[in-house]
Amino acid sequence: MIQTDSFIEQLRDRLAAPLPGREAQFRMGFARRVEELRLNPLPPSEAKVACVLNLLHRREGAWHTLLIRRTVNPRDRHSGQVSFPGGRYEDSDGDLVNVALREAHEEVGVSPLEVQVLGRLTELYIPVSNYIVHPFVGVLLGKPDFTLQPGEVEAILTPPLSAFSNPDNRKITDLNVAQGVTLKGVPYFDVDGHIVWGATAMIMSEFMELLG
């Protein structure tokens, strides 16, 4: 694990070096989805682009990340799930990192001026929604003071990174993802009773391997 006294500098260096990549993501991926991604490693040309922000902040002597539970929305394929702040790329965004910063501002009230972006993780294609997700990693420069956007965010979660490094929190379950649709044997992180699975779990899997 990266040493605390130089955490930011070491993390920036590791993000600039070759990343753990897809295999690290696959360790927390649903088996059928992983098989699909292995068979078709290149996303379709018409895939949409989205970006998310893994926002780190220091609290009570430990490093934490920021997750949100999305509101229930029948038009959203990821309705009610736990995820990073993030959303779809818009032409006005320009650089991809601006998407992650904009969405963090809109969803949890964090000003882009309060975020130091350290780098990015491996992009990840989500077949069910046809999005290529670009994960960015940043650190909050000010004190944690988050405000959720009630139209999109039901709850804000700030788990310590230790919740993801603890092997006891890596579990498997069956998930009802839609009416009449149940996924069997889905790996997930149990974070204080919240199920963190899918793309978010895969991104965190690579991030935790990066930390070592």
Language-model features: locations:
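NUDIX/MutT-family hydrolases
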Residues: L148-D190
